[in-house]
Amino acid sequence: MTMTDPVADMLTRLRNANSAHHDTVSMPHSKLKVHIAEILTTEGYISGWEVADARVGQTLTLSLKFGPNRERSIAGIKRVSKPGLRVYAKSTELPKVLGGLGVAILSTSSGLLTDRQAEKKGVGGEVLAYVW
């Protein structure tokens, strides 16, 4: 069975593993998911990621990040643009997550960018997710 929304599946797996205090979470690999993992690592929400060969295809494994007393580094994660309702933002109307404390992940003509990177480059695009 094919997956309708692989990004939503990734975010849901990440949210569930985070709330269950798992150290890692695995999912099917795709280039888009790797780019999202790179953004989450750069922004400090996860500690790292790796791609491994599985019996069928490749698997992306994310290493979750916790504080000294096992506090979650990801307080919340939300899928914004969905297959049934796409959400786009102009470069002048980029969303701010929690007044700039969180990050919005956008798919732009320059690749996947955070809201801050898109603002610097002056590009808009599809708002994939909010992470805070």
UniProtKB/Swiss-Prot annotation:
GO cellular component, one term: ribonucleoprotein complex
Any one biological process term the GO annotation gives: translation
Coiled coil: none
Domain of life from the UniProt record: Bacteria
Keywords: Ribonucleoprotein, Ribosomal protein, RNA-binding, rRNA-binding
UniProt GO molecular function: rRNA binding; structural constituent of ribosome
Presence of keyword Transit peptide: no
Main function: One of the primary rRNA binding proteins, it binds directly to 16S rRNA central domain where it helps coordinate assembly of the platform of the 30S subunit.
Subunit text: Part of the 30S ribosomal subunit. Contacts proteins S5 and S12.
Stored NCBIfam families: PRK00136.1 (NF001109)
Family note: Belongs to the universal ribosomal protein uS8 family.
Protein name: Small ribosomal subunit protein uS8
Gene name of the record: rpsH
